[in-house]
Structures are given as structure tokens and as C-alpha cells.
């Protein structure tokens, strides 16, 4: 299915440990580039997160952010560092004996850094939940890419219909263009009072017809339209293939324009270039 490289997804999970939020956004990029913003507690997850993203995406500049809010009330049982507390009491008593001033305040002792500590949360268990949420965020992210991709596909198919219409238009004008050019050549020869044998005249007319004949270019344009429709139906990433097809379209439209000797064909060649450029702009967004 066609996917856009531009997308956004957000998913939040909550547990007894607190809450975590994943945010993913991406823009156009020739290859896949990943950027991460992870809290210090889960910085070690970066290789795992990168691998999961790379296993499901192929192109785009992807920014992945994790926000973690621990629940302070769920920090666990407070633990007293008895050894440090005793050292502080001993030191405080010594100071008091030296100055004979002040009283030892137990609360001040407890407030001293490192005396009291909350029991650490099980970060491995939390990480497992966070990674499961990442998979869900990736699901949402891909759905967003596919939704936007279907819109891009519709726009491209609309332009392909325009290309087909221009090909039909040019093909319908070719008999009258060839006849007009034949009459024009004969008239020029008569004005110049040049007499050519019938065989020679026919040879000149054949050469002229070959120079201005665009049937081959029209056939190739029709083939490119058909192939582009087939590519749009594929399930894998097709952005690069579509980009290559636009190069082929451009080549044929340039040749068509160079052979044009009629205003109708010239206008169609210009319209083809416009349609091809519009498709190319949309394809820049496709994975």
C-alpha cells in the first residue's frame, strides 16, 4: 500500500509506576534517518527502538520522543541508611561538644542527602510496557502514513488520467498534421518552381513524416501510464520506482515537444510537462 513519508502519531500509557508518552513524526528524506529523545532512565532502549522502527519503515526522517513521568507516590518503601545516619549523629555530637551550642534535630539528619532513599522501581518491567506501547505507536504511525498515501495515490491517478487524455488528443491530431505538412511542402516547392519526380516527392514526404511522427513517443507514454498504475498497486515501498518513472515520462514529453510543429501538439506537450511535474512533487512524499 502506498505510504506517505509525512505522518504523526502519539500514544500515552499509564501504570502504577506513572505515565509514558511516545510521539513520532516524520518528513521527506531520501533514506531512513532516525532521531531519538529518551529520558535518562531509558536511554539504553535506543538500539531496540531504532531496530523496531527500521524493521517497519524504509524512508523518511523520523523523530521519536519518549516522555516519562514517574508517580512519586509509587516510589516504594523508604529505606534508612543507618550507617550514614549514625555518622552524622556522631559528627553533630562532636560539634556540639566543641561549641556547647545547638541541639541535634532528627529531621535535619533525615533530610541529609543519602540518609533516606525510596526503593527503586523495577525499570525493566516498566521498559517492557513502554516498548509494547512503542509497537502500538508504530501501528498508528503507519496507519497515518497509509491514509496520507491513499490521498497522494488519488492525486497521482488523477494526473495519469490527464496524461492519457493528452496522448489521445495528440494522436487524434496527427493525421491532419501530416496532411497539413504535406500540403505545405508541396506548396513551397510550387512557389519555388521546383519540379520533383513523384518518387522523389514521396521520399521527401516520408522523411518529413518520420521527423514529425510522434507515434512512438505516444506509445511509450501510454506504456508508462500503465506501468505507473501497476506500481501504485504494489504492497511494498515504491517511492524510488515512481521517481524513476517520472524521469521516463519527462524524456518522452521532451521528445514530443522537440518534434512539435503544430500549436495543438505544443500545447499538449506543455500540459504533459505540467502534469508530470505535479506527479513528481507528490511522489517526493511517498515512501
Curated annotation (Swiss-Prot):
Signal peptide: none annotated. Might interact with PNPase (pnp). Its cofactor is a divalent metal cation. Belongs to the YicC/YloC family. One of its GO terms (molecular function) is RNA endonuclease activity, producing 5'-phosphomonoesters. Pfam families: YicC-like_C, YicC-like_N. Contributes to degradation of small RNA (sRNA) RhyB. Upon overexpression suppresses sRNA-mediated RhyB-silencing of multiple RNA targets but not other sRNA's targets; overexpression leads to loss of RhyB sRNA. Enables degradation of RhyB by 3' to 5' exoribonuclease PNPase (pnp). Endonucleolytically cleaves ssRNA, probably generating a 3'-OH and a 5'-phosphate group. One of its GO terms (biological process) is RNA catabolic process. Keywords: Endonuclease, Hydrolase, Nuclease. InterPro entries: YicC-like_C (IPR013551), YicC-like_N (IPR013527), YicC/YloC-like (IPR005229). This is Endoribonuclease YicC. It comes from the Bacteria. Disruption phenotype: A double yicC-dniD deletion in rich medium makes filamentous cells with little DNA in stationary phase, has no growth defect in minimal medium, does not grow at 45 degrees Celsius. Slight decrease in suppression of RhyB-silencing of a sodB reporter construct. The keyword Cell inner membrane does not apply. Its EC number is 3.1.26.-. Transmembrane segments: none annotated. One of its GO terms (cellular component) is cytosol.
Amino acid at each position: 500500500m502506498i505510504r506517505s513519508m509525512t505522518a504523526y502519531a502519539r500514544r500515552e500509557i499509564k501504570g502504577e509506576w506513572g505515565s509514558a508518552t511516545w510521539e513520532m513524526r516524520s518528513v521527506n528524506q531520501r533514506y531512513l534517518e532516525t532521531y531519538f529523545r529518551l529520558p535518562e532512565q531509558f536511554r539504553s532502549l535506543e538500539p531496540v527502538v531504532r531496530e523496531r522502527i527500521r524493521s517497519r519503515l524504509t524512508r523518511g526522517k523520523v523523530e521519536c520522543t519518549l516522555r516519562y513521568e514517574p508517580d512519586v507516590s509509587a516510589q516504594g518503601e523508604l529505606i534508612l541508611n543507618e550507617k550514614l545516619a549514625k555518622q552524622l549523629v556522631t559528627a553533630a555530637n562532636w560539634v556540639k561538644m566543641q561549641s556547647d551550642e545547638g541541639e541535634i534535630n532528627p529531621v535535619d539528619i533525615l533530610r541529609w542527602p543519602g540518609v533516606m532513599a525510596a526503593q527503586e522501581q523495577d525499570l525493566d518491567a516498566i521498559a517492557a510496557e513502554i516498548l509494547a506501547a512503542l509497537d502500538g505507536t508504530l501501528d498508528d504511525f503507519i496507519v497515518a502514513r497509509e491514509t496520507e498515501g491513499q490521498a497522494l495515490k488519488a492525486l497521482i491517478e488523477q494526473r495519469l488520467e490527464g496524461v492519457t487524455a493528452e496522448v489521445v488528443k495528440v494522436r487524434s491530431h496527427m493525421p491532419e498534421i501530416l496532411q497539413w505538412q504535406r500540403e505545405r511542402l508541396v506548396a513551397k516547392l510550387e512557389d519555388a518552381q521546383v519540379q520533383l519526380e513523384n518518387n522523389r516527392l514521396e521520399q521527401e514526404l516520408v522523411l518529413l513524416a518520420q521527423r514529425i511522427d510522434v507515434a512512438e513517443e505516444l506509445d511509450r507514454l501510454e506504456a508508462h501510464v500503465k506501468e505507473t498504475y501497476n506500481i501504485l498497486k504494489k504492497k511494498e515501498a515504491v517511492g524510488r520506482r515512481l521517481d524513476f518513472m517520472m524521469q521516463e515520462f519527462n524524456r518522452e514529453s521532451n521528445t514530443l515537444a522537440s518534434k512539435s510543429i503544430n500549436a495543438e501538439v505544443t500545447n499538449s506537450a506543455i500540459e504533459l510537462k505540467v502534469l508530470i511535474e505535479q506527479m513528481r512533487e507528490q511522489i517526493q512524499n511517498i515512501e
